[in-house]
């Protein structure tokens, strides 16, 4: 990543047209959700088909929540993802094990970023793992209190949680994340993107 560039991840990708559009609009990464119960969940086969058509220039990130280590690694390989995003309460050894195979975005909530929190410190000290801050309920569309998080937000971390075309520039100006991730505010309906919102979001990030 070039100095100062904020990377853009369009998460909850479920269709090839949406993936191709996001890539053409300038997305750096696409997110495929494999977490049980998600309205945006895809199979490894679906994600693989999209990944192979989009090509290697755009990162493909598999999103998991509370799944076994074996399931994460098997699904990631079958889907041909290039990185893994991990949600939920997980031991450090689990995260480190995944990081032995793939770059990891480890998602934590605001309360876990407080000074002295063991999880946040462990994430920052684990090779191949980057912290991502998200809302307690991912995909809810509710933004975080960015100003309150300034003292706790580690440099080099990613930001998610209620980001959209209308507020991402302010979020970037406040926290200076290495990357931003959006889902619900880029959709026409769960799992289906609003092309204009995707373009506006990416443009707002690139201009920040």
UniProtKB/Swiss-Prot annotation:
Pfam families: PRAI. GO terms for biological process: L-tryptophan biosynthetic process. Its EC number is 5.3.1.24. Signal peptide: none annotated. SUPFAM superfamilies: Ribulose-phoshate binding barrel. Keywords: Amino-acid biosynthesis, Aromatic amino acid biosynthesis, Isomerase, Tryptophan biosynthesis. It comes from the Bacteria. Disulfide bonds: none annotated. One of its GO terms (molecular function) is phosphoribosylanthranilate isomerase activity. Pathway: Amino-acid biosynthesis; L-tryptophan biosynthesis; L-tryptophan from chorismate: step 3/5. It catalyses: N-(5-phospho-beta-D-ribosyl)anthranilate = 1-(2-carboxyphenylamino)-1-deoxy-D-ribulose 5-phosphate. HAMAP family: PRAI. Belongs to the TrpF family. PANTHER family: N-(5'-PHOSPHORIBOSYL)ANTHRANILATE ISOMERASE (PTHR42894:SF1). This is N-(5'-phosphoribosyl)anthranilate isomerase. It comes from Deinococcus radiodurans (strain ATCC 13939 / DSM 20539 / JCM 16871 / CCUG 27074 / LMG 4051 / NBRC 15346 / NCIMB 9279 / VKM B-1422 / R1). The lineage of its organism: Bacteria, Thermotogati, Deinococcota, Deinococci, Deinococcales. The gene is trpF.
């Amino acid at each position: 990543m070039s100095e100062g560039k904020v990377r853009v991840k369009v998460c909850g990708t479920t269709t090839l047209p949406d993936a191709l559009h996001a890539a053409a609009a300038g997305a750096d990464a696409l997110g495929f959700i494999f977490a049980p119960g998600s309205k945006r969940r895809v199979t490894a086969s679906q994600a693989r088909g999209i990944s192979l058509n989009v090509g290697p220039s755009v990162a493909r990130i598999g999103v998991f929540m509370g799944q076994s280590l074996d399931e994460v690694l098997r699904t990631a390989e079958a889907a041909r993802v290039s990185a893994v995003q991990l949600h939920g309460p997980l031991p450090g050894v689990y995260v480190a094990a995944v990081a032995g195979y793939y770059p990891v975005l480890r998602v934590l909530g605001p309360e876990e970023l407080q000074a002295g929190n063991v999880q946040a410190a462990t994430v920052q000290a684990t090779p191949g793992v980057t912290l991502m801050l998200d809302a307690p309920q991912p995909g809810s569309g509710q933004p975080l209190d960015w100003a309150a998080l300034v003292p706790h937000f580690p440099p080099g971390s990613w930001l998610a949680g209620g980001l959209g075309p209308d507020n991402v520039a302010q979020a970037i100006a406040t926290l200076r994340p290495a990357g931003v991730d959006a889902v619900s505010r880029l959709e026409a309906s769960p799992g289906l993107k609003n092309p204009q919102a995707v373009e506006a979001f990416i443009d707002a990030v690139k201009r920040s």
